[in-house]
Amino acid sequence: MRAGVFTALAVGLLCVSTTAESVPQRGSHVDRVLVLKKERTLELLSRGKVMKVYKVALGGDPVGPKTKQGDHKTPEGVYVLDFRNAHSQFYKSIHISYPSQRDRAVARRKGISPGGDVFVHGLPNGFGAVGAAHRLKDWTDGCIAVTNQEMDEIWQAVPDGTEIEIRP
């Protein structure tokens, strides 16, 4: 993304710790992902029980739901993590099924494009060393960003087809 942002954030790298919960065990069944935008968290759930919580960075203008392409907002609603990209420009990424039919209908009524290409992803390639410091500022175009190590954990724990709910 923006090289200057990541260079500045690298300074705070050693001052920011990761979440305390343990890594979800291989074979644990994550059946839902919950993102709380206000808290800047992503939770992995199994049968309603929180298995792991990650701190995240969101779109650069995160307050309110995504309504149009280029608004730098992270969508709000219930979607599906429907496919993954192991060769993403952001380390690894898992696609969020935004826009839904409802999102498209609202955008159509307004005569605008709802946008798309919203993912849960790691850090931009070449900036993995920034680590947890990336969370000091919301910086994505509307995606949900975690560290590369956290993305590896999510990648292993969350199967394609898992529901993701994104709340304000």
Could you say what each language-model-derived stretch is?
Residues 49-61:
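Short Gly/aromatic-enriched secondary-structure transition segments
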Residues 1-6:
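Bacterial N-terminal signal peptides that target proteins for export
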Residues 22-31, 38, 58-83, 102-106, ...:
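N-terminal post-signal-peptidase region of extra-cytosolic proteins
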Residues 28-52:
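N-terminal targeting signals for Sec/Tat export/insertion, comprising classic cleavable signal peptides
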Residues 7-15:
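Bacterial N-terminal signal peptides
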Residues 38, 45-47, 56, 84, ...:
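Surface loops and adjacent helix of pleckstrin homology
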Residues 32, 53-55, 78, 117, ...:
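Well-ordered beta-strand positions in beta-sheet-rich domains
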Residues 25-28, 83-168:
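Exported/periplasmic cell-wall-interacting domains
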